[in-house]
Amino acid sequence: KCAFVLVKTSNPSSVELQDMVAGDRLVYKVMGDLTERLARDTAGKYGYNVLGVVVGATHPNELKDLRRRLEKSFFLVPGYGAQGGTAADVQYAFDRYGHGAIVNASRSIMWAWKKTGKDGLDYQEAARAAAEQMRDEICAYVTIV
């Protein structure tokens, strides 16, 4: 079992809180470090701690920084697709083996049928195609060992 801590979310307004300075550090870095400290020595069979972090695909620099700092944390990465996150952005969420992250896309998959010009009755085919395209795009940047 695992819980996820909101560290740097994908929404544009995340800067209002998560980029504030707390002491001499940004709040999102404080939250990342706190998550690491609280989860220390909880790594399971595959090496990840029981506390994961939520870091948005729309913040690739923060993803890169936090992945370096939180090697044993699992990353939940919202914001792919409709919010603007790309495969090039999310590559930084994965560890050196191509593991340790779940990339989430909702609207870009659920509403993929709108791009087909059809009535949406076959929405599942459009959703499947969008999910497969997402997978292929990410695999172009992430090597899984």
Where are these predicted regions, by residue range?
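C-terminal helical cap(s) of enzyme catalytic domains, especially alpha/beta-barrels
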Residues: 90-96, 111-145
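Short, low-complexity, polar/charged sequence segments that are solvent-exposed and flexible
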Residues: 1, 22-27, 72-75, 94-97, ...
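Surface-exposed amphipathic alpha-helices with a cationic face
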Residues: 36-40, 66-70, 135, 139
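Generic structural signal for well-ordered alpha-helices
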Residues: 32, 36, 63, 87, ...
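Electropositive phosphate-/nucleotide-binding environments in soluble metabolic enzymes
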Residues: 25, 29, 60, 84, ...
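A C-terminal functional module that forms or caps the active site or interfaces directly
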Residues: 53, 57-104, 108-112
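Short, acidic Gly/Pro/Ser/Thr-rich loop/turn segments
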Residues: 10-13, 60, 110-112, 117
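Conserved anion-binding
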Residues: 1-51
